[in-house]
Amino acid sequence: MFFNILSYMSHKFLTEGECVTIFDEFHEFLKNTIALSYVRSFVKRGRKRNSNVVIASQNPEDFCDPAIISFTKPIVSTPTHKFLFFPGDINKDEYIKFMGINESEYNIIKYPNQGHCLYMCGLERYHLKVIAPAYKEKLFGTAGGK
């Protein structure tokens, strides 16, 4: 069933275009190289069809596993836009190298600071603070995220 879904997504994403594919908890996909091949194809070829990929993961260190880095490196290095938040307890030097950032850029996100991220757009880098409007804050509730 999983591969049927990926095949359907591939068809929509790469032939019809104008699609957005969102992968949350992406570290769960890293266990399957066939799924990674699909996602790598989406990332590399989707822009030609005006399609976009959103990848979210709380475990960025898993992307650096030598067994899968040939799949994950293009997934991480190809996108035009990246939002990097606090990466957690990781090997700093490995993360800096893998994400293609420098020490001062890493310093923006090295501590947990709610709402702060490093936004990368091509060669441009920005320190962003994401603030939810008051009417949206009610949607988040009071548990977690601190």
Regions found by a protein language model. Name each.
Residues 1-15, 107-146:
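Conserved P-loop NTPase motor module
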Residues 1-108, 134:
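Conserved P-loop NTPase motor cores
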